[in-house]
Each structure stands twice: as C-alpha cells, then as structure tokens.
C-alpha cells in the first residue's frame, strides 16, 4: 500500500487557532469515507497567529492530506469546496505528491496520551520499537488541542538517523493518536536543529 500526500491550495481570511477538530469535522462532511479510513491523516495548517486567538493563512498555505493512493485520487474532488471553518475555507486545486525519504523527519504535535514529557518519550519509544523503527528522537515544544472528549496534550518530535525505508515507513504510519486532527504526522526536516522553535 503506497501512501502519498495531497496538497490543496486554500483561501481563508481567518481560522480559530485551535482548529484541528473543526477542520476534521468539515473534511469528514465533504469526504464521506474519511471517518472510516483508519490510515488517513490531515496535516496541520500553517499560518500567522494573531493576538485575538485567530490564525491567518497566507497565500502559500496548503491543506495537506496523507492518504493511500486510491483515496488520494478520490480526495481531489474536494477542489471547489467551501468548508465551514472560521470565515470559510475555500479549497482550490489539488496535487498528489510522493513522500520523500529524508533521514530526519519532524512532527509538529505528537499525542501519546500523556502530558508528562518523560512518559511521552517512553511511550513514543515503545511504539517505535513495536514498529521496528529506531528510537533516535528529540522532543520539543509542548502543545495542546481541544476535542469534544477533552484536551489533548503532547510535544513536537523529531526522529533522526532513519534509513530511506524507515523514513517512508514512519511517514506512512505516523505516531501516537489523532492523525485526522493533525497529530503524529511526520514531514522531512533538513537537520537536527532547534526542534523546540517550530
């Protein structure tokens, strides 16, 4: 099973800063198979945080989905949709992109079910061991996210010293819980530096 990213152009004047669950709900309403697709992931959106608790997306912002190739092709039907999120998120054209096997990968927010950093690292290491992946990692900034079940807490995480096969494997499977709300999705990182400054 080949896993890829789908990148969509987006336009949106403003979003709530804690948008993860709301974005998933909006996408699940537009893609009727997303809720049942266990391996699907939704990348965090990148923008500029404002003092009033909102997030502004620039022209280069992209909505990114991590999906199997089959689902990726079906997801392209999102183009032209307007999602009920913030001031309204307009989805433009989408492109399918292969995952790149960098030796160092980074996730903005990994959730292993605990807020204590030492326990977080222990659980992350155990999950990596179980998947046959190396446990070379550096934790960074603490994060929190609201969901209907309560607040999720976790940390950014960098994995390094990966072989090409290991890099693609961890990008395809993710780490921890909450891939559909932006957690545990790894992307290439060019060097082992300043993971806490993401």
Where are these regions (language model features)?
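RNA-interacting cores
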Residues: 1-198
């Amino acid at each position: 099973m080949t896993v890829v990213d789908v990148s969509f152009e987006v336009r949106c004047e403003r979003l709530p800063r804690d948008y993860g669950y709301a974005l998933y709900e909006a996408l699940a309403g537009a893609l009727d198979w997303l809720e049942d697709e266990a391996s699907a992931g939704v990348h965090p959106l990148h923008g500029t945080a404002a003092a009033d608790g909102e997030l502004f997306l620039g022209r280069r912002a992209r909505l990114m989905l991590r999906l199997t190739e089959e689902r990726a092709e079906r997801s392209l039907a999102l183009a032209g949709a307007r999602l009920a999120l913030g001031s309204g998120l307009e989805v433009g054209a989408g492109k399918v992109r292969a995952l790149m096997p960098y030796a160092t990968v980074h996730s903005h927010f990994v959730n292993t079910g605990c807020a204590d950093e030492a326990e977080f690292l222990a659980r992350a290491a155990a999950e990596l061991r179980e998947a046959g992946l190396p446990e070379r990692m550096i934790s960074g900034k603490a994060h929190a996210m609201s969901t209907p079940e309560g607040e999720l807490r976790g940390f950014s995480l960098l994995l390094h010293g990966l072989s090409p096969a290991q890099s693609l494997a961890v990008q395809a499977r993710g780490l921890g819980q909450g891939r559909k709300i932006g957690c545990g999705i790894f992307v290439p990182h060019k060097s082992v530096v300043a993971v806490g400054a993401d």
